[in-house]
Amino acid sequence: MKRFFSSVKELIFEKKFMILILGGGIGLLSFFIVALIEDMDLQSMQDIFSAFPEGFLEFFGDLAVLANPYGFWTMEMLSFIWLYAGILFVFTASSLLSHEVENKTIDLSLSKPISRYNFLGSKITFLYIYIMTTIGIFFLISLGSMAASSIFRAEGIFLERFLAAYFSVVLFLGALAMVAKFISTIFLSTKKSTALGVMILFIMFFLGEFYVYMDEAIQDIKYISIFYYFNPVDYLVKADTAIFIRDIYILGVINVALIVGSLIIFDMKDIPN
């Protein structure tokens, strides 16, 4: 276990600046969005959007969300967190293992007193720490910005909803990253894992967000998309506990299944010299 924690520590120190830059960068974008909301008339925006065709509004969901500062922020930040950070996490997950195979250093790593389970487990542990810390920095900056905003203070600062949204974002991004990690244990190739991981991400986005425009007979395809189980508006604006519990449970199961699957496949995998 000493080697396990040592490996996690090495990866954290290696990526520490990336964590700060990414978390701080997304947090800065959030700060500007909060400042923008401060100067906007959200009610007027709702009136404008109400004139749009019904099919267009289905993509945004409840129109009243646009008139709520938390709703507008969630749509601008959390609904696109997969784009701001998810793609980078997919790339990181794809390269953590396969990079060592391609550089012919994996035999040296496995020759140390560490099992394959612990070796891959240390990289998966780092991946979740990476996601949790990056998103944690982003959420802290966002919370500070909201606490300083008169509009958000008037609406109320809901720490429990914010915490719920944080855990859902971590599990959502963790699931997207673990899809790429699972693929990387099969192909042991950064290019293949990244390409497939990003392709699956966009396919899931399409299925999870645009199923409402599909024929009713095939709309059940939405259930295979990770995006369908990520509904931050329902947590932050509507405080819908039932949907939150459902999403957290299913995302948790997906994460665990991908972790276990990755460990089993890597343990049985023949590593090329």
Language-model features and meaning:
Residues 73-99, 198:
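Long, hydrophobic alpha-helical segments
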Residues 168-202:
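A structural motif at transmembrane helix-loop-helix junctions in multipass membrane proteins
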Residues 115-116:
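Short coil/turn motifs that cap or connect alpha-helices
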Residues 31-34, 67-78, 121-176, 180-181:
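Secretory targeting signals
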Residues 90-111, 124:
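Transmembrane helix boundary and interhelical loop/hinge segments in multi-pass membrane proteins
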Residues 1-26:
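Aromatic- and glycine-rich beta-strand/loop motifs that create alpha-glucan
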